[in-house]
From Swiss-Prot:
One of its GO terms (molecular function) is RNA binding. GO terms for cellular component: chloroplast. HAMAP family: MatK (MF_01390). It comes from Lilium canadense. Usually encoded in the trnK tRNA gene intron. Probably assists in splicing its own and other chloroplast group II introns. PANTHER family: MATURASE K. It is found in: Plastid, Chloroplast. Keywords: Chloroplast, mRNA processing, Plastid, RNA-binding, tRNA processing. This is Maturase K.
Length: 512
């Protein structure tokens, strides 16, 4: 990141308004293809057979010129159909490589205004640098502290824009370079037309994987716009004076005001925003899923859902189904978020109160934030990865049988340690032990398949040596902190939650 900021200091005052010339700078493509600077966790390199992937700025200039020709898309598709089974160097893949190069370089360029704004904002506010602030596990201590005091929660699936032009219009507020916006439109429509025109499923898959960094940047810009306006409206509604409850008695008057909720005018905030006035509301989002929790009533959450549906319809010009927002009470509802099932438990207690010679019992309840590992989705992810059946029965992975014994054990152990590291925040570890058992037995059967033996004979020969590969660092540390607790049993019951603040992305098996 420091190297990235060093390049951004060049002509810093001109970059926001003149981004297009940066496409012809070689260091832009160096940044785009540097794995250490690639912030996308979905980055997957694509290899081209028969092409040496050499880079030339002269060919990039020619490609940009040719891309604006009307027959470029038709020629590209026809050439791919002619050379699909050719044994020589494929001209289509060479052009695809340069198109991929330009699009990835363009991804770096459009991020420059946002990177500069983020750096300048952190410098003005003097925000201390901390890796813990970037951990996705930092969300769970926040939920643990807040959800137990709230009443209702709304589980939101953020809809995707149905038209690319909406994404371009969002960026127009931050990027004033017109040629860059035109090039962005061309990229988006090219991808859309190729997916509709090319009939090969393999080619569609390659193009869908071509530049996830650009598409995730556009999607995050869209979500950022939604959240910016949400925070703005919420702040404005909090400044309004209280509305008399008498207005709720007349239903026609109530719905009359609800119809004007999407009209935003500085002089009319009191009319438009009072139905969603809620000073105590919490919003958490990860990727395309968000949580809106409040201490208010169920009716208030319905108003927020009404507001969201109308907001997406009138501001982003697409319809979002109301069922994408599930409203439930926190006391009897479990919702899935970031690989966990979250819920609020009520533990009743009887407290004995002694006053002089009289004593009496006081019934009270304590709300507790509970986190559970969803075993069924995890087993489904393991079955898709060919570690077990859909019922959770461990099976061998023959595709790994060609590796050495050390590589096989290391692969299984790394998957197991990563899952344990991510799910150590669970209050109950039985599901985690079952996942470990599946991976351990799948590893044994893979080794047995390689050596033409049985899993039972292999486990008897290896003993506990294979089991040690599946122990996590957290368990070894806890063995010193809690020496009286048996941590390595499959049927243990441990309730110590450990949130790891070094996790910056969700595990692929968890996210399926």
């Amino acid at each position: 990141m420091e190297e990235f900021q060093g390049y951004l200091k060049k002509d810093r005052s001109l970059q926001q308004h003149f981004l297009y010339p940066l496409l012809l700078q070689e260091y832009i493509y160096t940044l785009a293809h540097d794995d250490s600077l690639n912030g996308s966790i979905f980055y997957e390199p694509i290899e081209f057979i028969g092409y040496d992937n050499k880079f030339s700025l002269v060919l990039v200039k020619r490609l940009i010129t040719r891309m604006y020709q009307q027959n470029f898309l038709i020629y590209l598709v026809n050439d791919s159909n002619q050379n699909r089974f050719g044994g020589h160097t494929n001209y289509f893949y060479s052009h695809f490589f340069y198109s991929k190069m330009v699009s990835k370089g363009f991804s770096v360029i459009v991020e420059i205004p946002f990177s500069l704004r983020l750096v300048s904002s952190s410098e003005e506010k003097e925000i201390p640098k901390s890796q813990n602030l970037g951990s996705i596990h930092s969300i769970f201590p926040f939920l643990e502290d807040k959800l137990s005091h709230l009443n209702n929660v709304s589980d939101i699936l953020i809809p995707h824009p149905i038209h690319f032009e909406i994404l371009v219009q969002i960026l127009q507020c931050w990027i004033q370079d017109v040629p860059s916006l035109h090039l962005l439109r061309f990229f988006l429509h090219k991808y859309q037309n190729l997916n509709k025109t090319i009939q090969s499923n393999k080619t569609i898959y390659v193009f869908s994987k071509e530049n996830k960094r650009l598409f995730w940047f556009l999607y995050n810009s869209y979500v950022s716009e939604c959240e910016f306006l949400l925070v703005f409206f919420h702040k404005q509604s909090c400044y309004l004076r209280s509305t008399s409850s008498g207005a709720f008695l007349e239903r026609s008057h109530f719905y009359g005001k609800m119809e004007h909720i999407i009209i935003v005018c500085c002089n009319n905030f009191q009319k438009t925003l009072w139905p969603v006035k809620d000073p105590l509301i919490h919003y958490v989002r990860y990727q395309g899923k968000a949580i809106l929790a409040s201490r208010g009533t169920h009716l208030l959450m319905k108003k927020w859902r009404y507001y969201f549906v109308n907001f997406w319809q009138y501001y982003f010009h697409f319809w979002s189904q109301p069922y994408r927002m599930h409203i439930n009470s926190l006391l009897n509802y479990s919702f899935y978020f970031m690989g966990y099932l979250l819920r609020v438990l009520i533990n009743p207690y009887a407290v004995k109160n002694q006053m002089l010679e009289n004593s009496f019992l006081i019934d009270t309840v304590i709300k507790k934030f509970d986190t559970i590992i969803p075993i069924i989705p995890l087993i489904g992810s393991l079955s898709k990865a060919k570690f077990c059946t859909f019922s959770g029965h461990p099976i061998s992975k023959p595709i790994w049988a060609d590796f050495s014994d050390f590589d096989i054990i290391d692969r299984f152990g790394r998957i197991c340690r990563n899952l344990s590291h991510y799910h150590n925040g669970s209050s109950k570890k039985q599901s985690l032990y079952r996942i470990k058992y599946i991976l351990r037995l799948s590893c044994a059967r893979t080794l047995a398949c390689k050596h033409k033996s049985t899993a039972r004979a292999l486990l008897q020969r290896l003993g506990s040596g294979l089991l040690e590969e599946f122990f996590t660092e957290e368990e070894q540390v806890l063995s010193f902190i809690f020496p009286k607790t048996t941590l390595f049993t499959l049927h243990g019951s441990h309730r110590e939650r450990i949130w790891s603040l070094d996790i910056i992305r969700i595990n692929d098996l968890v996210n399926n």
